[in-house]
Amino acid sequence: MPTLTVAELVLDRRSDELISLPASASVAEAAAVMAEREVGAVLVMTEDGLVAGIFSERDLLVRVVAGGLDPKATTLSLVMTRDVKFVTPGTSSEAALALMHLHRFRHLLVIDGPRVHGLVSMRDLVLQMIKSGEGRYESAVRQARP
């Protein structure tokens, strides 16, 4: 089986599909965008267009809800994950998953030089690996059905 990379997940995405919000956006705005676009995280950008961090469902749960903060009055800059880990398109899916596991992240930034290609999620990587299983996934699903 060939080595799978994150390139197959992000390089074919159009750059306008990159979901990002300014650091000044409210948590409520971010939650609405995430729900509408059915994603678990968004990039948070500075006024200069640089990546400031990532805001994820986990940030919403741990920092906002458990912290008793008002989502409408709390900006992303206060609750986003700042220590953003990244991979390049050539990173293997296994290496990306290992990095996520090691640092307890569910999303990684994918960059190639100065270009941001997007975010890759643990779910994206697992689905990619399942689909590449040459029919084993479909067989397992058939066997699991009553």
Per-range role (PLM):
Residues 1-146:
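Tandem CBS (Cystathionine beta-synthase) repeat/Bateman regulatory domains
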